[in-house]
């Protein structure tokens, strides 16, 4: 947050913090934050580039990436993240049933559980690899896997933005890691 506001956007500390009662105390309310963030004219991609890249299938990790089916149907971010005109960061599984049947709430939960399990296994297996014992090709693969995994972690959706793509990426990474461990 400070990196984005102070370093990238060159905002003054006093924009959010006051020294009236106690130096550095946050003086802004959620409404103040929302006056800049998530206003109608803001494009989600401006701040949520990784999430949009996963959703649109343009993250650049695999050669044959596909967009999420909801992206194909022109469902924008606000459909899941703006129920009732109150923008939220993390969409709730219960919001799925606003457009889908009641069983669909479990679909998202199952997707996220599956991605979490894949992510945890891959992370655990990565810790078993000694990069110094790998040849240059595998060292480069390992670096790509770590960078891709960082993007998946930064997405924070556990597959909600594109379950099929994120699952395929993790499967491909796991295959490569398994080969390195053999």
Predicted regions and their residues:
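Surface beta-strand/loop "capping" patches
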Residues: 122-134
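Short, charged low-complexity intrinsically disordered segments located at boundaries
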Residues: 77, 128-130, 177-182
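Residue-level signal for cytosolic alpha-helical hairpin/rod architecture
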Residues: 30, 123, 146-149
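Inter-heme linker and motif-flanking segments adjacent to c-type heme-binding CXXCH motifs
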Residues: 1-118, 132-136, 152-164, 168
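Histidine-centered catalytic/metal-binding microenvironments
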Residues: 139-182
């Amino acid at each position: 947050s400070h990196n984005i506001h102070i370093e990238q956007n060159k905002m003054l500390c006093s924009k959010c913090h006051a020294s009236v009662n106690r130096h550095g105390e946050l003086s802004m309310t959620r409404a103040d934050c929302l006056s800049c963030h998530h206003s109608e004219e803001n494009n989600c991609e401006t701040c949520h580039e990784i999430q949009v890249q996963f959703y649109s299938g343009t993250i650049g990790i695999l050669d044959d990436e596909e967009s999420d089916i909801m992206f194909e149907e022109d469902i924008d971010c606000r459909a899941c993240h703006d129920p009732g005109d109150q923008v939220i960061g993390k969409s709730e599984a219960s919001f799925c049933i606003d457009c889908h049947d009641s069983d669909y709430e479990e679909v998202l939960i199952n997707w996220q559980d599956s991605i979490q399990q894949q992510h945890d296994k891959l992370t655990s297996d990565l810790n078993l690899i000694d990069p110094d014992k790998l040849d240059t090709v595998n060292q480069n693969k390992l670096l790509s896997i770590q960078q891709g995994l960082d993007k998946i972690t930064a997405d924070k959706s556990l597959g909600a933005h594109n379950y099929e793509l994120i699952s395929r990426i993790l499967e491909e990474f796991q295959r490569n890691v398994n080969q390195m461990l053999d």
